[in-house]
């Protein structure tokens, strides 16, 4: 088995999908989880205005709506959380995503004060954060806020990780990578677009250039620039297609060096890191 085949198998990626079937699969997955653990009353998700959180948010609200109708349990809710750092450049996209999702509840937590306070505390301890590390601080502060909300609403935190993100480890460890349940896992980027199109999402929300937008020195830096490879390349690779040798090498290098991000903390029983 080639490394490409191993990666595809590990991430559960498929070369082709039926959008309606995958929508149903994710919604039923969320419903089943909530029914298995009836003490869970809410799904909590940060909404950025990008493709992934828009899709995950819509699926969460669909699952909650169906469960309420089927069980009569009105205590179930989906909580969409806006988590800007100061003023967000694409705020209108966030509002458009909220309008599309129609969440039960919307909360806004501006993380700038908390991030700056943490940075100042570290500075006083003699640690000056780089812009890159400050970006990770933002991602972790966002997740911290979501877990606080989940803790106060008997909820779980929903993630947006998918195959095209997992393969490169393009998330912050214990930031946006630290969640309870990931309904998009297995899909690549173009497949996520197919699901949103089938759901009637406004096109500008999934046709915009994806960006983590964590660095102050490089605002709205496109993911594809940061990764050195396009999502079309990544999706082709995940679909088992032949890609240029340099593209495959770049993707595989990302995969191998970020393996620790896709695993629990390393113990004496692990040996993957020795390879």
Swiss-Prot record:
What this protein catalyses is: deamido-NAD(+) + NH4(+) + ATP = AMP + diphosphate + NAD(+) + H(+)
The record's EC number reads 6.3.1.5
Swiss-Prot/TrEMBL keywords: ATP-binding, Ligase, Magnesium, Metal-binding, NAD, Nucleotide-binding
Query: Where does the chain bind Mg(2+)?
Result: 52, 165
Q: What domain of life is recorded for the organism? A: Bacteria
GO cellular component annotations of the record: cytoplasm
Q: Which GO terms describe its molecular function?
A: ATP binding; glutaminase activity; metal ion binding; NAD+ synthase (glutamine-hydrolyzing) activity; NAD+ synthase activity
Q: What does this protein do?
A: Catalyzes the ATP-dependent amidation of deamido-NAD to form NAD. Uses ammonia as a nitrogen source.
Member of which family? Belongs to the NAD synthetase family.
Q: What is this protein called?
A: NH(3)-dependent NAD(+) synthetase
Q: What's the source species for this entry?
A: Escherichia coli (strain 55989 / EAEC)
Top-level taxonomy: Bacteria, Pseudomonadati, Pseudomonadota, Gammaproteobacteria, Enterobacterales
This protein's gene is called nadE
């Amino acid at each position: 088995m080639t490394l490409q085949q191993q990666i595809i198998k590990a991430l559960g990626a498929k070369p082709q999908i039926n959008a309606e079937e995958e929508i149903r699969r994710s919604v039923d997955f969320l419903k089943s989880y909530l029914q298995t653990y009836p003490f869970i009353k809410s799904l909590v998700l940060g909404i950025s205005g990008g493709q992934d959180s828009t899709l995950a948010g819509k699926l969460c609200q669909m699952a909650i709506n169906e469960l309420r109708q089927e069980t009569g349990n009105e205590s179930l809710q989906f909580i969409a959380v806006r988590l800007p750092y100061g003023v967000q450049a694409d705020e209108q996209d966030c509002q458009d995503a909220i309008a599309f999702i129609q969440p039960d509840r919307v909360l806004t937590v501006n993380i700038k004060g908390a991030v700056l306070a943490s940075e100042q505390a570290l500075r006083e301890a003699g640690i000056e954060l780089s812009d890159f590390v400050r970006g990770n601080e933002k991602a972790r502060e966002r997740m911290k806020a979501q877990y606080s909300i989940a803790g106060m609403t008997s909820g779980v935190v929903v993630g947006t990780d998918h195959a095209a993100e997992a393969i490169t480890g393009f998330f912050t460890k214990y930031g946006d990578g630290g969640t309870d349940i990931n309904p998009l896992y297995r899909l690549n980027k173009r497949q996520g677009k197919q699901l949103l199109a089938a759901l009637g999402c406004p096109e500008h929300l999934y046709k915009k250039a994806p960006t983590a937008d964590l660095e102050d020195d490089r605002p709205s830096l496109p993911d594809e620039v940061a990764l050195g490879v396009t999502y079309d390349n990544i999706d082709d690779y995940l679909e088992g297609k032949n890609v240029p040798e340099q593209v495959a090498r770049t993707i595989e290098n990302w995969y191998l060096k970020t393996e620790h991000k896709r695993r629990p903390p390393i113990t004496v029983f692990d040996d993957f890191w020795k390879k």
